Swiss-Prot record:
It holds the Pfam family MraZ. One of its GO terms (cellular component) is cytoplasm. Its main location: cytoplasm. GO terms for molecular function: DNA-binding transcription factor activity; transcription cis-regulatory region binding. This is Transcriptional regulator MraZ.
Amino acid sequence: MFLGTHSPRLDEKGRIILPAKFREELADGLVLTRGQERCIYVFSQKEFERIHESMREAPLSSKQARDYIRVFLSGASDEVPDKQGRVTIPPALRAYAGLGRELAVIGAGTRAEIWDADAWNEYLNEKEAAFSETDDDNLPGFI
């Protein structure tokens, strides 16, 4: 499970060092793809395969499903971390997420997310007020 917030830097070759806590789960390979809110989703290969299988169940007659699957999969890149735990983020994904040098890598349960540090801080500041007001109606059985 991916948890916490980490602050790696993007190097001049477009690589990041994965947080140590994430490396074991991602050692055999990972998939980077466009995330919602202009971040990059990071999935283990196994989790991405599970998601892909569920996407295959979506009806082809659903325009919304087709659109989502196209955007999600066309931005995907499978990567294998090097021995130092570094992963190259493809230029198109770096541009999509507006990544600068300072990053925030957050754990989101079954995935990690890579954010530009300023964008993450802005998002978090914006959402924290609503977070404190979330009730059982919005997330049944969760709180």
